[in-house]
Amino acid sequence: MEQMKFEQGDLQQEAPKRIKKRQPPRRRLRALAVVAAAVLAVVAAFVLLDRTAFDGLRRSIAYMQAEKDESGCARLFQYSSDGSSRYADLNGSLLVASANEITLLDDKGNAVYHTALQFSQVALSAADGQAAVYEIGGRTLYLLNSRGLVQQMDLEGDIFAVQMGQGGRFAVTLKKTGYKTTVSVYNGKGEPLYDFNSAQSYLLTAAVSENGKYMAAAAMSQDNGSFVSSLQIYKLTSETMAAEGTLEGGVYEMGTVGGRFCAATDKALYFVKTDGTVTSYDFQGASLSRCGLGADKFAAVLLENYASGGQTHLAIVNAAGEEISSMAVDSEVLDLSAAGRYLAVLYSNKLVIYDQKLRECAVLEDVSSARRVLMRSDGSAVLAGTNAASLYLP
């Protein structure tokens, strides 16, 4: 049998390289999922343990190009205003409305919308990045967002009140011929969603629920010769009243807090569910000085008790009507504003940003030029003066 011969390889040649096996796709995806889960766990722990620090991190990233002074303020906005001016923050843009004009400035201070007005009494309502500017008793409404004018609306009645809500939805209370009052609900484009004509009760103001399914109107009616207040609740698919919650006192301000309707009267702060269930925070004879309903899960009230020598009291209340925290206030309060998890109080000599426990998150001294404060949900605040506004970045 013939012997087989094998050729020897060249030992001086480079040794063959081992070919690395490709990792199966499932294994790679599993590894990426583990890494992503670990990162999310770290972020979640950080958020849960210190939300204030997390908001500070967000601000440092979002406003890294802002030129700040030593106090942490960035001077962004220049405008003209007068004693009638109203202000709103629209996702970083500043809206200034007076009886003579509307001006909208973007986050760089550039005017993106301007129009002249001839209003006798201007009013403004803003929420969730949109605003309505109107004249009390007039028929024209300007609907705006951070980019400019959405729609100029000419309504069929005299406007009593407008309340902006979540998702751009808003309620307009007006006097229409043939009825005591009418409430119209619109979406963020100014398109009609719902109309309710009241022939029995005078409706003072109204709000849309956070989920956009209900409308609640503050009603005033007579019972045995005396006036009675209530919150009438309607589903936006029916003109039949779904529920009613009894209130005491006239309604000064209305909105939503923690998924419930919230009405501030001269007697108490009321929280009403869509089924009519009412919880309240009684003012105990004190007078309501200021109210902030813009936070996610709490309302803030500034109360003055003239019976006890004019003592001023600041309270934070949750949607169950329970006082979360409170403090005595010795300084004059020029303005207050709530957003997200924060409350900004503009005193005559300083600005203080609190959390819902009334713990100080930030303090800014020397605010003599500021007349209004607009709290932002990220923990920053806009300080508005007569002709200029600055952004405070703690």
Map each language-model feature to its residues.
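Non-cytosolic head/periplasmic domains of membrane-anchored proteins
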Residues: 113-218
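Repeated scaffold domains used in trafficking and secretory/extracellular systems
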Residues: 28, 74-88, 117-129, 157-166, ...
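Solenoidal tandem-repeat scaffolds enriched in leucines and small polar residues
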Residues: 179-272
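Hydrophobic beta-strand positions that form the internal "hydrophobic ladder"
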Residues: 94, 131-132, 169-171, 212-215, ...
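Hydrophobic membrane-insertion alpha-helices, especially the h-region
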Residues: 30-48
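N-terminal Lys/Arg-rich, disordered targeting/topogenic segments
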Residues: 1-30
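Structural motif
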Residues: 50, 101-103, 139-143, 178-184, ...
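A short beta-strand motif characteristic of beta-propeller blades
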Residues: 65-79, 108-116, 147-154, 191-197, ...
